[in-house]
Amino acid sequence: VKKIAIACVIAGAVALSGCSSSSDESTRTSTGPAKVAPPAILQAGTLKICAPNDGTPPSVYHDETGALVGSEVDLGKAIAAKLGLKPDFVESAFAAVIPTLQAKQCDVIMAQLYIKPEREKVVDFVPYVYSGTGIAVSKETPANITGMDDSLCGKKVMVAVGTTAESLSQEQSEKCTAAGKPGIDINRNNHADVSLQQVQNGQVDAFLDTAETLGYYATKTGARIQLAGQPFGTIKIGAATLKGNTELHNAIQQALNELETDGTYAKILDQWGQSNLSIQK
């Protein structure tokens, strides 16, 4: 009943144009087409989702087989299923996802898109997860690090050049020295796998990166790491629809609410190591 109700809401809201990648066959089989829709949508029964072809784990990326996978992909499929539609992912470079939406080649963007004021001028957002910075430490020797605080004073950490993690580490190091404590020994490497290996080998005490990236490595790769404290410097990520497309925006919000209520949302985030970035917290 809920699928039919939501499908009625979006009947006039979803655009159908442009080219896209093939959708998940199992989702197509289980959900079927929208029960109520204009002729074009009734024939296709599709929710076109803009996704980046240059994304990163765990949000949206290509696995070793070339398939599009990730937490946002799974959320997109689940939202489409709640709407009674099958998902069809329209891939483009990240920089082109908003123009692709504006050209009506897709209906909604799910592409690690931060909710920022300048973007809210052209799209409407349904927030579904946070992004933030996290601290990875060794499971065996966590070095008494508790988060972005004075427990980092005098510790050797690794960051990537030009990242939020780098600037926040520098700020915390200055706080350490101002308090008469040793500063943070900040080292730089742009390869997360190398940095995490150094954490596990005891060459550095911690590696700072996006919390979602660290959660992915801890959950999906078997890395012997854990996150110290909670993510910080967080910002919301949202599903973006064309400005003023209220029917589709509201339908996606309702679908997400139902995914939160039935536990699907939490299950997806847990599978991808993003439970600590839930919008429900």
Residue ranges and their predicted role:
Residues 53, 130-137, 219-257, 274-281:
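Periplasmic-binding protein-like
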Residues 95-96, 113-120, 170-171, 200-233:
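A ligand-binding cleft/hinge motif common to bilobed small-molecule-binding domains
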